């Protein structure tokens, strides 16, 4: 089998994720991040995957990196703020919300 492009790996990762195949999605997202550590969608999806398997704390750096790479995606802000709230970091969540508002 030929090597996948980043876009193909991301698409397959999303499909695996939606199908409940967390290990396969993790493998694909990890491969993308090895090639492009700041890839915004792969970072965001790794964060979503981590939250989905109960590793909420693990999700934070992925969401933060996704936001730093592409702060224009509203879902990245929502995921990051939601995770901070789930961890009881309300002050941090409010600060990030204020930051999101200032970025439009």
Where are these regions (language model features)?
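Register position in tetratricopeptide repeats
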Residues: 18-19, 52-53, 86
């Amino acid at each position: 089998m030929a090597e996948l492009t980043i876009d193909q790996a991301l698409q397959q990762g999303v499909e695996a994720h939606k199908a409940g195949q967390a290990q396969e999605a993790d493998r694909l997202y990890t491969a993308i991040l090895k090639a492009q550590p700041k890839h915004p969608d792969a970072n965001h999806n790794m964060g979503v995957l981590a939250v989905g398997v109960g590793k909420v704390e693990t999700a934070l750096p992925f969401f933060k990196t996704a936001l730093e790479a592409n702060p224009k995606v509203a879902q990245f802000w929502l995921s990051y703020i939601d995770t901070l709230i789930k961890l009881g970091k309300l002050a941090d969540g409010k600060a990030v919300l204020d930051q999101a508002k200032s970025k439009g």
